[in-house]
Swiss-Prot record:
Gene3D superfamilies: NAD(P)-binding Rossmann-like Domain (3.40.50.720)
Protein name: SUMO-activating enzyme subunit 1
Locations listed in the record: Nucleus
Keywords: Acetylation, Ligase, Nucleus, Phosphoprotein, Ubl conjugation pathway
Tissue specificity: Expression level increases during S phase and drops in G2 phase (at protein level).
GO cellular component: cytoplasm; nucleoplasm; nucleus; SUMO activating enzyme complex
GO molecular function: ATP-dependent protein binding; enzyme activator activity; protein heterodimerization activity; small protein activating enzyme binding; ubiquitin activating enzyme activity
Positions where N-acetylvaline occurs in the chain: V2
Pfam families the UniProt entry points to: ThiF
Length: 346
């Protein structure tokens, strides 16, 4: 019989039934860790809605949705938590009802204050913080706070067909399920493969591992001038540099590129591309000019993919199961593929 939930982190019968498939997938202990975790999610546009949905369904203890902006006419195109007729309402408040209905067992809260006004003490109540729609300065500042207080930090965004995620888990320990290697008994001769070790898929063992992450500031400020870095440049996805351009645009304009001002924003993006890549000592040709055609607005399918990946990484980090992405994940909707890149000091 499953015990009722206690302060020690037990799972009630009702929760065991609700999360039965997940418990079978990653185990009871992992689900207990998840049920004891509180997450802060900043930014409730399309990507934020996907992340919120996935975390609530996964069964975290609590989710605080923070957004000080109002719902715009464009938001419902990718934000499914907002009801029709919500334009002008606070974005987080407009998302609360549908978010809570996804899983009544999760404590879903709303905060309408600007993230930039929050003191360091605000963040210490959470086990993980996930930022979307934030400026580079805010991303760096909150990451530093989380790193200092051993809070798991995530950030991500969607720009048109492109999306990214980043994680800084500090020194992160996790367990990974490995298939046992079974040696063939001596004297058994059934072919040339008998001398090799074989994998027995019916037997597995849990292996403890540790990985160390770098701060987002270091990951965004890679020095590409060294010979080693120049060699690595050939293997680095251009989406990393596209992210630098889009974050600079957001800083300069206080918003993301908009289809309402397509011509103006396209010209500015090209100028920022030249400035950013020149400052890094990299040829602008690394990011072809046609990138401006594919980075406007949030696209619902891209939000679904990136939001699924980002929420999955948060769940893995909180449950301490399976290797995390270290540290960037980039998704290209035009090519239909994603790539994990580890960027920062080596």
């Amino acid at each position: 019989m499953v015990e009722k939930e206690e302060a020690g982190g037990g799972i009630s019968e009702e929760e065991a039934a609700q999360y039965d498939r997940q418990i079978r997938l990653w185990g009871l202990e992992a689900q207990k860790r998840l049920r004891a975790s509180r997450v802060l999610l900043v930014g409730l546009k399309g990507l934020g809605a996907e992340i919120a949905k996935n975390l609530i369904l996964a069964g975290v203890k609590g989710l605080t949705m923070l957004d000080h902006e109002q719902v715009t006419p464009e938001d419902p195109g990718a934000q499914f938590l907002i009801r029709t007729g919500s334009v002008g309402r606070n974005r987080a408040e407009a998302s609360l009802e549908r978010a809570q209905n996804l899983n009544p067992m999760v404590d879903v809260k709303v905060d309408t204050e600007d993230i930039e006004k929050k003191p360091e003490s605000f963040f210490t109540q959470f086990d993980a913080v996930c930022l979307t729609c934030c400026s580079r300065d805010v991303i760096v500042k909150v990451d530093q706070i989380c790193h200092k207080n051993s809070i798991k930090f995530f950030t991500g965004d969607v720009f048109g067909y492109h999306g990214y995620t980043f994680a800084n888990l500090g020194e992160h320990e996790f367990v990974e399920e490995k298939t046992k290697v079974a040696k063939v008994s001596q004297g058994v001769e059934d072919g040339p493969d008998t001398k090799r070790a074989k994998l027995d898929s019916s037997e597995t063992t849990m292996v403890k591992k540790k990985v160390v992450f770098c701060p987002v500031k270091e990951a965004l400020e890679v020095d590409w001038s060294s010979e080693k870095a120049k060699a690595a440049l050939k293997r680095t996805t251009s989406d990393y540099f596209l992210l630098q351009v889009l974050l600079k645009f957001r800083t300069d304009k206080g918003r993301d590129p908009s289809s309402d001002t397509y011509e103006e924003d396209s010209e500015l993006l090209l100028q920022i591309r030249n400035d950013v890549l020149d400052s890094l000592g990299i040829s602008p040709d690394l990011l072809p000019e046609d990138f401006v055609r594919y980075c406007f607005s949030e696209m619902a399918p891209v939000c679904a993919v990136v939001g699924g990946i980002l929420a999955q990484e948060i769940v893995k980090a909180l449950s301490q199961r399976d290797p995390p992405h270290n540290n960037f994940f980039f998704f290209d909707g035009m090519k239909g593929n994603g790539i994990v890149e580890c960027l920062g000091p080596k």
